[in-house]
Amino acid sequence: MHKSIALLLGSLLLLLGACQSDQGKIQSDEKDQDIKKVTISDVEHGIRANIETRIQNGGGYFNFQNDTLDLSLKLVRVHTEYLSILGPNEFFACVDLATADGDVYDMDFFLKGVPGDMQVTKTDLHKLNGKPYYTWKKGKDKTWFTVPVQNASNDLLGVMEGTDRFDFTYEIQLPEITGSAKMWVPIAQSDRFQTIEIISLQAPGTQEMIQEDEYGNTIMYLQLLPEHSNQKITMSYRVERDEKAPYADQDSDLLKYLEATPFLPVGGRFSTIAEEIISEKKANSQLTKARALYDYIIDNVRYAKEGTYGTGDANYACDAKSGNCTEFHSFFISLSRSAGIPARFAVGAAIPSERDEGKVDGYHCWAEFYAEGKWWPIDISEGNKYTPLATYYFGHHPANRIELSRGRNLTPDPIPRSGPINFLAYPVLEIEGEPGYAETTFSFTRGNPGS
């Protein structure tokens, strides 16, 4: 059913679609002299005041009910870029609110009133986790109305929801070995979101499965000799992986995830930057603060494999404002920890959704932060690539991935001569105590064809 919304023509510019720059939202016509008496700051104050009142009256939650939903929500962010003056005493706001399970609802608010006294007159659910319920259309009579979107899907943007099943192969090509060599290889493990079965493992030399206790990683430790030169190491996993949403983890040592490590500094300029971001966004909870930091990185860091990228050095990310997934998430973790929000790192591989077999383009990493009694999964570099999914990736990881290890500055026993392992996605190789390189490739087949 179409819902007609009469708007004042001389002052309205509606940008179609969801709260995003390419489709847009409602904006004001700044030529209308009568409207200039009200500022966007007034509209922001008005919507925040309405939401705060609803939260206070709702026992700490923004409660929303319609014919099919009964939601208790927490504020994530006000989209200040889409606050609009529709006409004299008529305004628009777009706000993200989240359930305790991490589902993020994009809600459209219409308000009436004057500065200091604005009241919400209409509230619509526009999106769920980045997928729209409706889009905006302009009719021949120059009024705007909403058109329902049926079966909106994230599939085309690389996301598989629910559960994914695939076989994953991790292959290492050993180089020429001139003397004794040692290698540390991550071993994927089962947890509450992924079930891992090793279906084959072929490796030369002496093998030992060792534990890295700080973050609970399992590592295959190999001792190799010259006769193992140019041989292959192959591990194949059968994987069943569930989509991840915010979850409780009672075993977490939160203080550990507030500490600095060599590539994840805490304090100093990171505290200054975090404070400025949080203050500008008027964020007053762990959830809204984390979203403000997430948005800052999306808006200011460029995904580019150039310079000294791939080390996960938050200082480099802060200076260069570019990098791959390691820079994006390291920068976030340093800012988050500096703001008093526990945050942690994991690495693995993202499995293509658009095909069912073939190569995987290297490792991928992601992060989690702690708020509202749960760990919230995020993927900022993917949110940066695909604007429509920036909401989804704040609170979710899709099913089509495998985690290989977690944590930074790993100290297994035995430890490499070079010291703690920064993070473990590709193997660490030492030949006669010096760093070596072994080409590593990933591949997959979806659907467990061997079962």
Residue spans for each PLM region:
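C-terminal motif of bacterial Sec signal peptides marking the signal peptidase cleavage site
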Residues: 16-18
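Bacterial signal peptide processing site
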Residues: 20-22
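N-terminal secretory signal peptides
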Residues: 29-87
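C-terminal partner/receptor-binding element of secreted or periplasmic proteins
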Residues: 37-45, 118-154, 293
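Intrinsically disordered, low-complexity N-terminal segments that are enriched in acidic
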Residues: 149-242
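Acidic low-complexity segments
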Residues: 212-214, 232-319
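Hydrophobic/aromatic-rich core segments of domains that either
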Residues: 330-418
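Low-complexity, Gly/Ser/Thr/Pro-rich intrinsically disordered linker/tail segments
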Residues: 393-451
